């Protein structure tokens, strides 16, 4: 393996987050009863005609801009012709000749080093139906047919499994924060095809490539590449031919399995889509699409670290989930203690989410309630230990404010000087011999009295106010 350079290119199919399909008014919703989210256009009934989803084009433009691509404002579609059971029309509407985006780039970080990944193209198309293989039968669910997609294709510039995984993870983050797609790999809304070849170091010519289709997790991408590199290396060392073919990844054996040879590839006979005329996008509309794009995670990350003084590790944890990110940003509208918000989110709350296998938006917890609890600690109304009692309550019930819960539980800290003095005086009177040590060991004396005060009150005394009163009363007593 040391004698060969790994060459990897990646194609990602991304389902767009639209309410209806790319060329029909049928709804888009994952997990519905099979063959219910379809209409005449999806099923290719005679006389049905496609209508372009404007939102789909907007999401494609957002993505092109985030990937630093040249945007073609003259939108054209083509037909990709082939017969397969999951394609009722006998063709797929795509953009073979005029992709909406070209010549992009995306920076990734691998082992502390930054690498710029060249992206060749981004084009819009429609998805096919879903095939379900069960026993000896194949079932077809046309709910997915016609769903809007963008396909994003890199140039063959990736040189390791780690780089490939870093690229897909970074692309997923971009798409997630743009709200272009929910990018759930396990549900197929982000699908990855990896083209892999090897060549002797110093060689410029490409060897025969192998395409591994439909990898549905980052870990499977890594395993598939590592297996394929090892397989191809053995073939090359034995002077055997590497067949240019399409393979699939078997996650039970962690190996790739041949599907078909590239020599069997179909001639798709592309031609212009006659039912959709070219559309010239207005410059102002394209600019609005870009201007109204959501803030990317990279920008948020800089703001969290530089402005909010959150550690880079904590910022990265928050930014792994768009729900967590939105909750964090809503919470800090009500408090300035940004680091405390981050700490509670990534520790106590994340632990609860892991236990329940859910996301923060599914909890009853309100950002304003979390901020209120943090503010009450900062104001010495409650102690930090009381958050362990309050947090589980507000995560399950949002009907009461935090201060109402504090009063019901009677855990409000005592801050009134007279009230504290009335509690401290009896403790001092019971420990007069302790006062004799005050001149030599003042800290020991005051801490001992503070400990007894906390014991008497169950810890519900403002520590700063309590200590000030103790020092004042002790010094008055020994005068």
Swiss-Prot record:
Task: Report the sequence similarity comment from the record.
Answer: Belongs to the GatB/GatE family. GatB subfamily.
- Whether Nucleotide-binding counts among this entry's keywords is yes
Q: Name one Pfam family in it.
A: GatB_Yqey
Physiological role: Allows the formation of correctly charged Asn-tRNA(Asn) or Gln-tRNA(Gln) through the transamidation of misacylated Asp-tRNA(Asn) or Glu-tRNA(Gln) in organisms which lack either or both of asparaginyl-tRNA or glutaminyl-tRNA synthetases. The reaction takes place in the presence of glutamine and ATP through an activated phospho-Asp-tRNA(Asn) or phospho-Glu-tRNA(Gln).
Which keywords does this Swiss-Prot/TrEMBL entry list?
Answer: ATP-binding, Ligase, Nucleotide-binding, Protein biosynthesis
Per its UniProt record, what HAMAP family does this chain match? GatB (MF_00121)
A single Gene Ontology MF term assigned here is: asparaginyl-tRNA synthase (glutamine-hydrolyzing) activity
Q: Which organism is it from?
A: Mesoplasma florum (strain ATCC 33453 / NBRC 100688 / NCTC 11704 / L1) (Acholeplasma florum)
Q: What are the BP-aspect GO terms?
A: glutaminyl-tRNAGln biosynthesis via transamidation; translation
Q: What is its EC number?
A: 6.3.5.-
Q: Which reaction is the catalytic activity of this chain?
A: L-glutamyl-tRNA(Gln) + L-glutamine + ATP + H2O = L-glutaminyl-tRNA(Gln) + L-glutamate + ADP + phosphate + H(+); L-aspartyl-tRNA(Asn) + L-glutamine + ATP + H2O = L-asparaginyl-tRNA(Asn) + L-glutamate + ADP + phosphate + 2 H(+)
* Name under which the protein is recorded: Aspartyl/glutamyl-tRNA(Asn/Gln) amidotransferase subunit B
- Subunit structure and binding partners: Heterotrimer of A, B and C subunits.
Q: Does the keyword Magnesium apply?
A: no
Write down the Gene3D superfamilies for this protein, in alphabetical order.
1.10.10.410, GatB domain, N-terminal subdomain
Record-linked SUPFAM superfamilies: GatB/YqeY motif (SSF89095), Glutamine synthetase/guanido kinase (SSF55931)
